[in-house]
C-alpha cells in the first residue's frame, strides 16, 4: 500500500469544521465480518444508495514473499488470474463480467495482490462464482504462461527499463534494503521473468492463493446474510492450505547514507531520496502521513513552495510512503530543469528537510495537512469502491477493520511536537538512500 502525493493541488476543506468533525465515521454498525471454516475472512458493508457492488479480494502475496530466482511471481499472477480455469477459457472472466455491465482490475505491491470487481447487484452470484473458480482451479497452460511471460517482459520494458524514473526507483530500492525482500522489484528482475518454471508458479499459487490467506470485501447493495450464504456456497468448499512460513528476515539498521548514480539518455536530471520509515500499523503512522503531506502535497507544500516556486531548482516534487507489513521507505522525488547542478539542488533540499527535522512545521502547515487528509478520506469514503478499499486496507494492514472508523480522530490528535519528533527520526541522512539520474553527457 502506498500513500502518494505529487505537486498537484487538491481541494482543501475549511479550516474549522473539517478537522473537528472527523471523529464520527458512519457505518461501523453496518459492517459484518465472518471467517469461514477454511479460513477465508469476509467483510460486508451494505450500502443501498445505488444498485451496485464493489468487491476486493486481498491476497497476502507480494514481492516480499519472493526469493532470488522467482522475483515477479506475485505480479505474474495478476495476469494469470484472467487467463482461464478448468471450467473457463482465457479471457472468459472479462467477457462474462462485461456482459453483466461490470468491470474489473487488479494491482500488485510489495505486500499484497488485490483483485477488484465492480458490478450490478444482480451479478453477485456470478461474480462470486468467477472469483472462487479462479482460486480453486486456475489453469496452468504452458502456451498461456509463455504468452503472458512475454507480456510481462514488455510491461517491464515500458515501466522500468525505458522509464528513467522507474529505473532509478528500482535501483534505489534495491540499494536501500540489504536483507529484506522489499529489495526485489514487484515486476521482477529480467532474468527471473524469463526463467520461471511451471512448478514455481504452482507452488506459489498453492501457498498464497489459499482461502486462509485471503480477505474478501463486499461493499454496496447487498443483504449481508444473503451475501454470506453465497460466499459460503462458492468459497466454502475450497480447502485451506498450510500457512506460508513467516518471513524471518529483518532489515538491519542502516548506518550511513547510500548513493546510486545512473547516466542515461534523458532530457532532465532526476533526484530521489528514500528514507527508512515505519510499517503501516506503526502508531506513528498518522504523523508520518501528515509529515509527507506538509512536504509535498499541493502547490503550497513546503518543498514545492521552496524548490519549485521560490528557488526554481525543480520543476516537480512528489513523494510517497510505502505503508507495508514491515518497515519500508518514505520517498521524495524531484524532476529538475535541464542543465541543473544536482549538488546545488541537494543542498537546498537538505536545508529544508533539516529545518523540518529540527523545528517541525508551522501550525498552519499542520492544520492544512490535516484538512487535506480529512478531505481525501471523506472523498474516498463517499463511494462503495472507496469503502471496500479502505475496509480492506485497515483489516489487512492494520489488523482490524474497526480502526478505519477511528482513523480521522487519530490524524486529528497529532500534535506539532509529535510530527517534529517523527520528522527527526525519519529525515536522518544516515538512514537514507539517494538516487541521482543525469543525462549521459552531463559532467555531474
Would you name each region that the model predicts?
Residues 47, 56-58, 157, 174, ...:
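His/Glu-based metal-binding/catalytic segments typifying zinc-dependent metallopeptidases
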Residues 2-24, 31, 215-217, 334-335, ...:
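C-terminal regions of mature proteins
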Residues 49, 54-118, 184-185, 297-313, ...:
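M16/MPP (pitrilysin/insulinase) zinc-metallopeptidase core fold and M16-derived inactive scaffolds
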Residues 84-87, 118-151, 299, 318, ...:
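M16/insulysin-pitrilysin zinc metalloprotease superfamily fold
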Residues 39, 57, 75, 97, ...:
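Buried hydrophobic packing residues in well-ordered domains
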Residues 153-171, 250-269, 306-316, 325-327, ...:
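Short acidic/His-enriched helical or mixed secondary-structure segments at domain edges of catalytic enzymes
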Residues 2-21, 178, 186, 210-211, ...:
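An aromatic/glycine/proline-enriched structural segment found at the starts
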Residues 2-15, 83-85, 127, 159-210, ...:
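Scaffold signal of the M16-like zinc-metallopeptidase fold and its non-catalytic homologs
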Amino acid at each position: 500500500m502506498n500513500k502518494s502525493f505529487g505537486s498537484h493541488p487538491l481541494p482543501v476543506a475549511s479550516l474549522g469544521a473539517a478537522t473537528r468533525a472527523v471523529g464520527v465515521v458512519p457505518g461501523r454498525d453496518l459492517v459484518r465480518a465472518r471467517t469461514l471454516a477454511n479460513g477465508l475472512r469476509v467483510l460486508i458493508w451494505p450500502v443501498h444508495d445505488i444498485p451496485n457492488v464493489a468487491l476486493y479480494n486481498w491476497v497476502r502475496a507480494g514481492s516480499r514473499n519472493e526469493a532470488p530466482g522467482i522475483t515477479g511471481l506475485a505480479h505474474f499472477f495478476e495476469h494469470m488470474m484472467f487467463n482461464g480455469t478448468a471450467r473457463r477459457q482465457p479471457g472468459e472472466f472479462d467477457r462474462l463480467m462485461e456482459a453483466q455491465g461490470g468491470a474489473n482490475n487488479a494491482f500488485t505491491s510489495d505486500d499484497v495482490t488485490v483483485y477488484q470487481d465492480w458490478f450490478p447487484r444482480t451479478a453477485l452470484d456470478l461474480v462470486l462464482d468467477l472469483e472462487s473458480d479462479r482460486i480453486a482451479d486456475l489453469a496452468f497452460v504452458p502456451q498461456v504462461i509463455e504468452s503472458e511471460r512475454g507480456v510481462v517482459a514488455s510491461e517491464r520494458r515500458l515501466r522500468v527499463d525505458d522509464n528513467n524514473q522507474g529505473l532509478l526507483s528500482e535501483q534505489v530500492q534495491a540499494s536501500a534494503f540489504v536483507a529484506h525482500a522489499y529489495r526485489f522489484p514487484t515486476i521482477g528482475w529480467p532474468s527471473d521473468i524469463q526463467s520461471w518454471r511451471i512448478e514455481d508458479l504452482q507452488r506459489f499459487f498453492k501457498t498464497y492463493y489459499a482461502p486462509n490467506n485471503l480477505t474478501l470485501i463486499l461493499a454496496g447493495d447487498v443483504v449481508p446474510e444473503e451475501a454470506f450464504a453465497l460466499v459460503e456456497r462458492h468459497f466454502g468448499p475450497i480447502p485451506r492450505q498450510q500457512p506460508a512460513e513467516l518471513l524471518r528476515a529483518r532489515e538491519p539498521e542502516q548506518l550511513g547514507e547510500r548513493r546510486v548514480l545512473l547516466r542515461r539518455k534523458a532530457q532532465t536530471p532526476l533526484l530521489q531520496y528514500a528514507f527508512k520509515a515505519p510499517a503501516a500499523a506503526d502508531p506513528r503512522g498518522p504523523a508520518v502521513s501528515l509529515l509527507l503531506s506538509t512536504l509535498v502535497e499541493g502547490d503550497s507544500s513546503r518543498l514545492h513552495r521552496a524548490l519549485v516556486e521560490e528557488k526554481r531548482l525543480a520543476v516537480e516534487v512528489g513523494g510517497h510512503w510505502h505503508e507495508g507489513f514491515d518497515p519500508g521507505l518514505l520517498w521524495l522525488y524531484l524532476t529538475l530543469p535541464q542543465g541543473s547542478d544536482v549538488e546545488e539542488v541537494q543542498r537546498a533540499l537538505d536545508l529544508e528537510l533539516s529545518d523540518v527535522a529540527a523545528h517541525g512545521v508551522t501550525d498552519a502547515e499542520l492544520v492544512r495537512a490535516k484538512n487535506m487528509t480529512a478531505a481525501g478520506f471523506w472523498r474516498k469514503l463517499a463511494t462503495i469502491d472507496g469503502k471496500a478499499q479502505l475496509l480492506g486496507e485497515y483489516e489487512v494492514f492494520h489488523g482490524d477493520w474497526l480502526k478505519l472508523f477511528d482513523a480521522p480522530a487519530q490524524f486529528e490528535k497529532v500534535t506539532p511536537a509529535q510530527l517534529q519528533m517523527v520528522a527527526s527520526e525519519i529525515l536522518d541522512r544516515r538512514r537514507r538512500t539517494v538516487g541521482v539520474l543525469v543525462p549521459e553527457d552531463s559532467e555531474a
